[in-house]
Amino acid sequence: MENVFGNKLVSARKMAGMSLQDLENKLEKVVSRQALHKYEQGKMKPDSQVLLALSNVLHVPVDYFYSVPAVKIELKNIDYRKYSSKISKTEQLSVEEKAKENCERYLELEHLINPNEKSEYFVYDKIIETADDAENAAKKLREVWSLGYDPIPGVVEMLEDKGYKVIELDAPDGFDGMKADVDGKRIIVLKKSVKQGEDVVRKRLTALHELAHHSLQFSKKIPEKEIEKLCHTFSSAVLYPADMAKKELSKDRFHFYQNELMLIKERWGISFSAVFARALHLGIITSFIYKRFNIGYRERKLHLNEPGKFMSKEKPVKMQRLVYMGLSKEILTINEAAYYLGMSAWKFKEQLHQIV
């Protein structure tokens, strides 16, 4: 017989980033570490007082411990943004467990509402060894997805339209993004925006960086650090295509002005620093000028609060759309809809406004 409660307790504890000892401490002697271990092993069951305490400390509803997902998954080929994602092993496990929980709900919902969902994943067959190879891959993506030379209004929306499962999580400050595979489906995990009006250019670049890890094949001779740089080249080239960058930036320049960079950022949704890197790669500036730009950028503390704003929400909405479709067709109840969106039924009812 499956140990449902024990497995869900382990999952909730990992999502909270707690060890058994941490959980015992948070429960303030309501139950011992040894008893918690027995709960997880399925050798003991908690009483109602302990169950409520676990629910409060782990921030999950009591029902969570007894819900059995219809779709059970295993995240495979997990890959983080190395050299930029600086999180501990415990935080990493927490992120992965949250991603797994979200994926289970997402895929279960999709199976109920839209089981014949088609995907248009980008696949690039050539081996990537150089920055020019990454540039060519970006050109190919724009061609295959019929993007032309126009700015991309919403990167996250574009990826969702192509069938990628984009998930946002509450995650530690050191986390940028990760990718994973689930039964042939491609998952992209991003950090949830916490501030109203937060600058989205970094999230756009991160989403495309994870797309690069999904889509590109790198030479085995290349070290991981170089692969990360090539992913960055690809994502920047998708955002700001070479022909347009060369036309707008012009060659042999010695200066960049903040006003000009703001115009580029607000049109293309790309950060100042990524524009500098594009200019260097495309031969518009020399490495000496590039170094000067970066020094000036940091001296003015622009990396802390970069001016200019790209007007896009960059939030995944596919799961919400599936929920509302399920409600409108009476496939889902209010309680089920709330479960799939990971919120309480009363909170969901509060924000639900039926027109007809």
What does each of the following model-derived ranges do?
Residues 1-356:
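Active-site hotspot residues in diverse enzymes, especially metal/ion-binding acidic/histidine motifs
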